[in-house]
Amino acid sequence: MQNRSLAPSITAEGRMSDKPDLPPPPHRPVAALQCYLAYLTSFVVGALTWWRLLESGTVEDPFWIGFIVTCVSTVAIWIFSIANDNSSIYDPYWVIAPPILALAFKATAGGGLLGDWSGRQVAVVACLWIWGIRYHTMYSWGGWRTGLVHEDWRYEEMRAAPVPYWLNSLLGMHLFPTVLVYFAFAPGILALVADPATQPPFGAWDALGVAGALTAVAIELFSDEQLRKFRETDAYHNGVAMRQGLWKYSRHPNYFGEVLFWLSMIPFAIPVGALAARPALVLAGPVAMAIFFRFSCWLMDVRSLARRPNYQQVVDEVSAMVPWVPKS
């Protein structure tokens, strides 16, 4: 999802959060209790929707069951966002949803959640939980602790769009990132719902997926920590661009880490035959995520060029996203 930018819910450094890059716009505060209630409601509504779809048999494909569920859960969050006039209530959803959905998908596969797990299923679920825990450990959302005292500045800008705010909030601030992350997760979903009894054991493709996902998490971890420390320096507050650590080789290494994580889901889909059977579904989401973040790099560069005097030199010398040797 990180990470993140293009999506109004992904911040300047690739994370959905309420980072103070700019002075927070005055908005209606949201109590922590409201944030907890929003996510409890979202979870209950999602679980009931999943159960109802399974019971009715109206949708048989687990992938599309999950898609409907995550969209319905997102709408539940959106209702709280509109009721509280603050769309930042949605901010952590895109990281919370995939690990929980992963367990739900395993429960629908052969053997259920408490039955036998294949090495592949363990790997996919473990990678998602490591990814999610890393994010929530480094970016403790204020909504859980003290509530929200402001709304993300991107949402503030989108309020000026020539469309009704409620519609812009629903489609652009809530459903768009939900759908993007869900389809990026598609290869992992197809690997999870495959019956372990009929699939090959953990192999080279799975090892590649694990290696890629863990490398991605490490890149995000180090780049975010390096940026956090830099934000505490006088250089940052004086408008100097970050050019240390991984940021020496990429203007947005955390974006690269997020893209790499979702691309790393693709190898898990290969041994179960999903890539051969449903290539568009396996590839479209991760590729769309890569395109999304690449365009996000451009948007953030435009903003940095207006705010940081030396940033044009960074653009000229440092790779936009993929780490590479600087030109000088």
Segments predicted by a language model, with ranges:
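Active-site neighborhood of divalent metal-dependent phosphoester bond hydrolases
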Residues: Y135-Y155
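Membrane-interface helix caps and helix-loop-helix hairpins in membrane proteins
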Residues: S81-S88, L114
